[in-house]
Amino acid sequence: MFKSFFPDSRWFWLSVVAWSAVSIFVWYSFNTQLGAMLGLDLSNTEPVIGVGHFFTDSFTLFYLYYAISLALFALFWFQFTPNRWLAWSIFGSGLILFSTYFSVQVSVAINNWRRPFFDAVQNALTAGSTVTSKQLYGLLIQFAEVAFIAIVLFVLTRFFVSHFIFRWRTAMNDFYVSKWAKVRGIEGASQRVQEDTMRFASIMEELGVSMVEAVMTLFAFLPVLWELSKYVSELPIIGHIASPLFYASIAWSIFGTLLLAIVGIKLPGLEFKNQRVEAAYRKELVYGEDNTDRAQPITLKELFINVRKNYFKLYFHYMYFN
């Protein structure tokens, strides 16, 4: 699934992790110095309300740093192991990551907007308020600007992700078709090439971006939780710890991920077995269309019993997983 689209090297994913770690370390260790070299001021940490949130010196430096880091990583693999899908796999993945990060920052911008807006609404309802309608309308316009960016970004991201995933499916299709002589003996080989690549593409389109967005959301709001932790000194049951909201969010995310992984450990195997029993049942029906000796009631009943048993197992395991 992956070697057909991404560089076919055992070192690729290790290089992704290593380069990401190096890039993150350099950014958090030297971003102030890098900004000073470019004449950018990163000292202002006050949240900017409205679309200006995306055009601060800090964001400008990040955009430039991310683009250079991605370009250097891609340049290495273009030289090391060039292939047809390299541009789509690396630059496409990088663009999706950036778009997802930007969409999370839209949520941060809206979160920053809520405080002054609702403070203004609350003050407007008190006696002797100095809040004017112009101020309220100005805040509403700022929200509309951010919301417009969010809508446009969502539409463009989904459009690009659809094309990205179909290119991935094309790469998988070409890979398996080139090995058709070897895989044709596998039960339901035609379905594996056609349906499994389609299902994989659909799953990645629906869940892949959601997973990345969930991780990005966590990291985007960690600085907010760090600041809010100044006003919280302890957690229930646990007691006093430094920056409790910050560490509690990380611990809960890890705990929830591990819990779901353990609880759902049997589901992939059952889904795979489900494909096999469904394929066996369908294959017998197909044979019965051209051969009267096949697809007899007794045989079909036995095959469908296997389908039923596997589905009932799936229902049971999904019950406690859900």
State each model region's role.
Residues 107, 150-154, 158, 199-224, ...:
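Membrane-embedded alpha-helical bundles that form the substrate/pore pathway
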Residues 199, 276, 280-283, 287-322:
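An intracellular "coupling" helix at the cytosolic face of ABC transporter transmembrane type-1 domains
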Residues 32, 107-119, 154, 158, ...:
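Short helix-terminus and kink motifs of transmembrane alpha helices
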Residues 22-39, 74-79, 103-123, 127, ...:
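Juxtamembrane "helix exit" motif at the C-terminal ends of alpha-helical transmembrane segments
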Residues 10-19, 55-106, 126-166, 237-262, ...:
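Transmembrane-helix motif of ABC transporter permease domains
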Residues 138-141, 197-247:
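Hydrophobic alpha-helical transmembrane segments of ABC transporter permease domains
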Residues 163-174, 178, 248-293:
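Cytoplasmic coupling helices
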